[in-house]
Amino acid sequence: MNTYEELKARGLIAQVTDEERISDLINKGEAVFYIGFDPTADSLHVGHFMALCLMKRLQMAGNKPIALIGGGTAMIGDPSGKTDMRKMMTKETINHNVECFKKQMSKFIDFSDGKALLVNNADWLLDLNYIDVLREVGPHFSVNRMLTAECYKQRMERGLSFLEFNYMIMQSYDFYRLYKDYGCNLQFGGDDQWSNMLGGTELIRRKLGEDASAMTITLLLNSEGKKMGKTVSGAVWLDAEKTSPFEFYQYWRNVDDADVVKCLKMLTFLPLEEIEKMEQWQGRELNKAKEILAYELTKLVHGEEEAEKAQIASRNLFAGGGVTGDIPTTTYAKADLDEGKDILTLLVDTKLAASRGEARRLVQQGGVSVNGEKVAAIDKTFTTAEFNEEAALLIKKGKKSYHQIKAD
């Protein structure tokens, strides 16, 4: 099975401009491809995971990745799939986020000796002269055609600013510059970027008379059709300070049964033959498949040592083995805990619940226990007197979410 066939078998490919040409480039290791990342936060998250894994997979096959950081386009905001205008960011915030991205991407991509490139589109977009843009790029775009693009449809009903309308032109110009300056012949992106990607291939054809290609990556959706990578406390981040290795492990350990094999195929580097055997697994074996998924992805992001620690901590909890230092922890001043904290406050502070209203419902539905005992009253207060032998309160939400409380 060649590289392109494996991408298809793993369910990674959605749309392509020219399958034969793209397949040929990838299989021969001649693809110089780019994926864009808007630095709208100081960490990458699970939503970026598919792209990072694809870049790693293709680099291993001899192709050259370009990670394009949207330092310039982040100052505009991408309307694709959005119903509201994104808040504009300062240059300082963007630059900080770019540095954070570099560090995280290096875990997936080898940037040594020119094997991959990290490029910031601020390098060319911020110096563009408006008249030059109108003269060089403007003639190659039809407003009528742009307005029919999928990426603008949602915003048209509620209002699309001229600022955001320019996003397609900017992204198309990115591809043009990467093709011209770095020999980039292929762009990857999500389905919601398809119109912008086609704009780039068209601009290259019109200005340079040459062919470039585009391919969209399958979105990472669960069995209910919702994007994966969200919890009650927000996004699942790749930064250990934002989402601990244990929380990251638990997220994948707790995926629905229907999603396990799909995630193994799309995100891990295990051989397909090994994964296909797991498709027949049921019951306890399926839980083993979830452990494999969680371990492999945690190892990829946080390293083998952290993956092993997270796996041990998870198994201890499920076996009733008590608290370990790898479980997410919130620490209060001892004086505050001596006075007591009510269960609703604890649930919100630990982000096991998004609000006091949600916390109240969890308790009333019998979904919360502390140190193995179910909490029945919404006004139940806990102090250091209730600490267990590990000097902690172990809060459990539902069957799979844990958090410990300690005193400083």
Model-derived regions: residue spans:
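Conserved nucleotide- and phosphate/pyrophosphate-binding catalytic cores
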Residues: 204-408
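NTP-dependent nucleotidyl-transfer catalytic core
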Residues: 1-193, 198-201, 208-213, 328
